[in-house]
A protein has these predicted regions:
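Short aromatic-glycine-(Arg/Gly/Cys) micro-motifs in beta-strand/loop hairpins
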Residues: 8-21
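Short acidic, gly/pro-rich beta-turn/loop elements at beta-sheet edges
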Residues: 15-17, 28, 37
């Protein structure tokens, strides 16, 4: 099964956050790379806690960051 994890930048809080409704998962971090690693650790744990099969499992990360430049 594939789980899509949406990652976005919160400019006000100055953090990256990740949300996945199918796992369920909601995490945040100051570092994009650290957030990816946290997701890879937390996803199987959350799947197990919610009695979902953790394996085989694929995570698809979709990231977005918007900036005002003018």
């Amino acid at each position: 099964m594939e789980h899509i994890i949406n990652i976005a930048w919160d400019d006000e809080a100055r953090v990256w956050y990740a949300i996945c409704d199918s796992i369920p998962l909601a995490l945040e971090s100051n570092s994009f790379d650290a957030l990816i690693e946290r997701c890879k650790i937390a996803a199987p744990e959350m799947l197990e806690l919610n009695n979902q099969t953790a394996s085989p499992c694929r995570l698809c990360f979709r990231a977005e960051r918007r900036e005002n430049i003018a």
